[in-house]
A protein has these predicted regions:
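Structured interaction patches on ligand/partner-binding surfaces of diverse proteins
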Residues: 57-103, 197-225
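Hydrophobic side chains in beta-strands
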Residues: 5, 80-81, 88-96, 108, ...
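A short, Gly/Thr-enriched small/hydrophobic beta-strand-prone motif that recurs across taxa
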Residues: 1-7, 107-122
Length: 225
């Protein structure tokens, strides 16, 4: 049996992983570098589940379940990472017959999607904002990539930066990389801080993003803004 992963179904600017892992029945290779792999053994005739994925920083894999690591930033243990590495998977059922050679081309599915959120402050106090931080709840901490099921609703930390150039100058933006969403509700909670000496108290804002994020788990190669 030989395998050749097809990485073409990935987003613009997303690199092809250098390493990939293989599982065919009880035959496993944890890290392989190359465009194709020939299994170093013969297989008895029968049906097998072929599993391929790339080892990715910030993601652990057990069987066909991938889990996002907790945030590595100090004091943020309650959050999952918003910056795992790009992660691709493939699961395929194959049938092996006696005295035959096989070359399987496996289409790799991108499992991480970029989400960009933009806050547009208005009014006389917009220029007095010093910083915006927040969180997004209802994001997926796990995925079973054999079934496509997203689970373990979690929260990701958001740190916004002010856009200084272009048509969006004056707005605040943050981007995170997510496995998907895993709950009926996605709640954005942000806190606006104002510069010292302004006598303005921080403002807390909550926004329900469930509707705009309803289809987030599909079309992952395309970023969502």
């Amino acid at each position: 049996i030989s395998l050749s992963p097809d990485w073409t179904a990935r987003g613009e600017g997303v690199p092809v992983p250098e390493k990939w892992a293989i599982s065919i029945g009880d035959y496993t290779v944890n890290e392989y570098i190359g465009q194709s792999h020939e299994a170093q053994r013969l297989f008895e005739p029968g049906s097998y589940s072929l599993v391929v994925y790339n080892p990715a920083d910030g993601i652990t894999v057990e069987g066909t379940t991938a889990t996002v690591s907790a945030s590595s930033e100090a004091g943020q243990d309650a959050f999952i990472s918003g910056s795992p590495a790009w992660f691709f998977t493939a699961v395929q059922d194959v049938t092996i017959e006696k005295d035959r050679e096989y070359l399987f081309s496996v289409v790799m599915k991108q499992q991480i999607r970029r989400l960009t959120l933009i806050v547009e402050p208005t009014g006389k106090t917009a220029d007095l904002i010093e910083g915006i931080e927040g969180s997004l709840s209802g994001v997926a901490g796990k995925i079973d990539f054999a079934t496509g099921s997203h689970s373990s609703p979690s929260e990701v930390k958001l740190d916004f930066t002010k856009i200084s150039e272009g048509a969006d100058a004056g707005k605040w933006m943050t981007s995170v990389l997510l496995l998907g969403i895993a709950d009926d509700k996605q709640q954005l909670s942000v806190n606006m801080r104002f510069i010292k000496g302004s006598a303005l108290r921080p403002i807390a804002i909550d926004s329900d993003l469930s509707a705009p994020l309803a289809g987030f788990n599909t079309d992952k190669p395309h970023p969502l803004v």
